[in-house]
């Protein structure tokens, strides 16, 4: 934890008062499960809080930045900015991936590189920062880390995989595309959806996500990857 404290202080001018919050933010459920007897806390609740404050701050930014954009346009752009892949990228940019505590099995299976885990970690850190320093500290951190990328327009070029897949399949003729929810697991604040894409009655691909929409996008992305190999 000492190295993480030094990283936050030197890179982002952040010094936590409650180090327990910081440690919890960087503790994955797999680690907590392996240390149940020690009553170790994990970061899912902080992730829930961080997701909410991130949505609020990015919404405020977009509302002020784009006075002529419609609600629908701003919602799309916000979704691009806070999508799992983006948040995982910011975790890596901040070197957070080096400090998360994972269970042995999760570590061996490549969890430290997994977008889902790193995206959740970024949100959990925001939740911990909110509780320790307040919302203005979260705003300052996001202005330093995320907003410059938004200003460059990097997120406006993110692909809508569902639209790309539909356009690709339409070039092959008349096709019927159906997105079907296979499973829905986890508590209300940490859902995990699995979705399949059925094309003309046959399963083309599957995807995972924290919402139906994210799972559909993941399934479409996987389908495009498969089709590019054919």
UniProtKB/Swiss-Prot annotation:
Q: Where is the active site?
A: 51, 123
What's the superkingdom here? Answer: Bacteria
Domain RNase III, residue spans: 1-134
Its Gene Ontology biological processes? Answer: mRNA processing; regulation of gene expression; rRNA processing; tRNA processing
Query: What top-level class of enzyme does the UniProt entry assign?
Result: hydrolase
Q: Which GO terms describe its molecular function?
A: double-stranded RNA binding; metal ion binding; ribonuclease III activity; rRNA binding
Q: Which Gene3D superfamilies match?
A: 3.30.160.20, Ribonuclease III domain
Query: Which cofactor(s) are needed, names only?
Result: Mg(2+)
Q: What is its EC number?
A: 3.1.26.3
Q: Where does the record place the DRBM domain?
A: 160-229
Q: What is any one of the record's Gene Ontology cellular component terms?
A: cytoplasm
Q: Which family does it belong to?
A: Belongs to the ribonuclease III family.
**Protein's UniProt name:** Ribonuclease 3
**Which source organism does the UniProt entry give?**
Streptococcus pyogenes serotype M28 (strain MGAS6180)
């Amino acid at each position: 934890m000492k190295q993480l404290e030094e990283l936050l202080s030197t890179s982002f001018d952040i010094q936590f008062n409650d180090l327990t919050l910081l440690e919890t933010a960087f503790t994955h459920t797999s680690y907590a499960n392996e240390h149940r007897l020690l009553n170790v806390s994990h970061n899912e609740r902080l992730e829930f809080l961080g997701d909410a404050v991130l949505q609020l701050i990015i919404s405020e930014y977009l509302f002020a930045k784009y006075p002529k954009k419609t609600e629908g346009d701003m919602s799309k752009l916000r979704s691009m900015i806070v999508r799992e892949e983006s948040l995982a990228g910011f975790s890596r940019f901040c070197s957070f991936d080096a400090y998360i505590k994972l269970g042995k099995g999760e570590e061996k299976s490549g969890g430290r590189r997994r977008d889902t885990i790193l995206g959740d970690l970024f949100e959990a850190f925001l939740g911990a920062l909110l509780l320790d320093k307040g919302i203005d500290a979260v705003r300052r951190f996001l202005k330093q880390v995320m907003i410059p990328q938004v200003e460059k327009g990097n997120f406006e070029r993110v692909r809508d995989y569902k639209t790309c897949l539909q356009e690709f399949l339409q070039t092959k003729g008349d096709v019927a595309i159906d997105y079907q929810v296979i499973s829905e697991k986890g508590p209300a604040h940490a859902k995990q959806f699995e979705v399949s894409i059925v094309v003309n009655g046959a399963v083309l691909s599957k995807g995972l996500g924290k919402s139906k929409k994210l799972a559909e996008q993941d399934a479409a992305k996987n389908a495009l990857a498969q089709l590019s190999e054919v």
